[in-house]
Amino acid sequence: MQPLQLGLLDGQQLVEFLLLFLVVLNMGIRYLSHRRHQRQAEEGGPDAITRFLALEVSTVVLVLVAFVYMTIHYHGGMIISILAITVLISDFFEFEARKVEARNELPLESPRAAIGASFVLLAYVSYVALFFLVEPFWSAVV
């Protein structure tokens, strides 16, 4: 018998809502991170721009909770994990792009790739977590 053969036994229903909360929290922290990067670029130039620890931590926690969700629902967990990893990778490259923009004295653009990936992740996690709201209508049609 494997340790995770039975999956997560306690709090299975809470993981979906935890994912939804983490995605929304991550998007809010991304907004604060972008404002902080703009302020750092104005005050100290390109060398003053540093990673926002809260964004990094929230993204890693989001990926880890997505992996936990994969032990409960393989298909949905795999999709959410791939999307969360996409957000993590895009955050890494968006930070580097902000530093390049600051070095070239260009205005800092919003992190479009990370925002786009976050909205796709938000749409899927909302579908998974809030499906009970549309289930009666869905069952009538399908």
What is each residue range found by the language model?
Residues 54-68, 116-128:
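Core segments of transmembrane alpha-helices
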Residues 1-11, 140-142:
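Short, strongly hydrophobic alpha-helical membrane anchors
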Residues 126-142:
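Juxtamembrane boundary at the C-terminal end of a transmembrane helix
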Residues 36-50:
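Short juxtamembrane and helix-loop transition motifs at transmembrane-helix boundaries
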Residues 95-113:
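Membrane-helix boundary connector in multi-pass membrane proteins
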Residues 15-18, 22, 51-54, 58, ...:
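Physicochemical signature of membrane-embedded alpha-helices that form the seven-helix bundle of GPCRs
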Residues 15-36:
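N-terminal signal-anchor/start-transfer transmembrane helix
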Residues 66-96:
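Short alpha-helical packing/oligomerization segments
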